[in-house]
Amino acid sequence: MFDFMMLEKVREKGPLVHNITNIVVANDSANGLLAIGASPIMASAKEEMDELAKMADVLVINIGTLDGELVTAMKIAGRAANVAGTPVVLDPVGVGATSYRRKVVQELLAEIQFTAIRGNAGELAAIAGEAWEAKGVDAGVGSADVLSIAEKVANEWSTVVIISGEVDVISDGTRFAKVANGSALLPRITGSGCLLSAVCGSFIAVQDDAFRASVEACASYAVASEYAEIELERKLPGSFRPLFLDALASWSVEKTRAKAKIQESGEHK
């Protein structure tokens, strides 16, 4: 079902990805998007959100480092993107960590129709109202079924859900896929999940089926990380980061097809 040609579409079209993101990851996200052939813009002034919504091919909202002005900009941008027909991706970083983050995400979900939501299991469990022990912005631990969480959030908010982890889970509420790829070094570099949200956004920008786009984005991203790890002399995060950027830039459809481990099903049983 997956031919992994969306990567070539991203390179061909160079979608403009508007990121309202956090101060920790902005540089890495921009460079990662450039590496895959997308065109990033990192803008958060509320005064220009309406204009950017008409220009951008996708909007990616990341709540990693929040403040009141930024939240206002997110809401303006998201509403304007909905009016313009621009897809919107939410990365609810650390939503389960504080009551303020939970409040902001609930407001965003109430005011904006999101095409996709990408986060770790703890973040999506918080949105689903499932018990989970959050650990700051990390996944933490919990016993809830990840597929059930994905299904619940996808159906409640009419969106595609991407839950990142050792095995990524993607669902639109009726279709489900698991991607069992990825380097163990990815969680050891800050912002790897945030960049994945932006990469998912760039794939969604060139494909009407957000579920298919998200599965291909996750698989391609994870396979690239595996190739980066192969090039390492020492399995250390500082050495891995630049090699991963290079791997993103040298992605090929053939490499992804050769290594992607995708399990797809039509329903969650």
Swiss-Prot record:
Binding-site positions, substrate: M42, G191
Q: Which reaction(s) are listed as its catalytic activity?
A: 5-(2-hydroxyethyl)-4-methylthiazole + ATP = 4-methyl-5-(2-phosphooxyethyl)-thiazole + ADP + H(+)
Q: Name one Pfam family in it.
A: HK
Record-linked InterPro entries: Hyethyz_kinase, Ribokinase-like
* Family, similarity comment: Belongs to the Thz kinase family.
* Keyword annotations: ATP-binding, Kinase, Magnesium, Metal-binding, Nucleotide-binding, Thiamine biosynthesis, Transferase
What NCBIfam families does its record include? PRK09355.1, thiM
The biological process GO terms on file are: thiamine biosynthetic process; thiamine diphosphate biosynthetic process
> What does the UniProt record say this protein does?
Catalyzes the phosphorylation of the hydroxyl group of 4-methyl-5-beta-hydroxyethylthiazole (THZ).
Q: Which cofactor does it need?
A: Mg(2+)
What's the name of the protein? Hydroxyethylthiazole kinase
Enzyme Commission number, as recorded: 2.7.1.50
Any one GO MF term held by the record is: hydroxyethylthiazole kinase activity
Top-level EC class as recorded in UniProt: transferase
Extract the Gene3D superfamilies matched here.
3.40.1190.20
**Pathway this chain belongs to:** Cofactor biosynthesis; thiamine diphosphate biosynthesis; 4-methyl-5-(2-phosphoethyl)-thiazole from 5-(2-hydroxyethyl)-4-methylthiazole: step 1/1
Record carries keyword Aminoacyl-tRNA synthetase:
no
User: Can you tell me which residues bind ATP?
Assistant: R118, S164
What's the source species for this entry? Answer: Listeria innocua serovar 6a (strain ATCC BAA-680 / CLIP 11262)
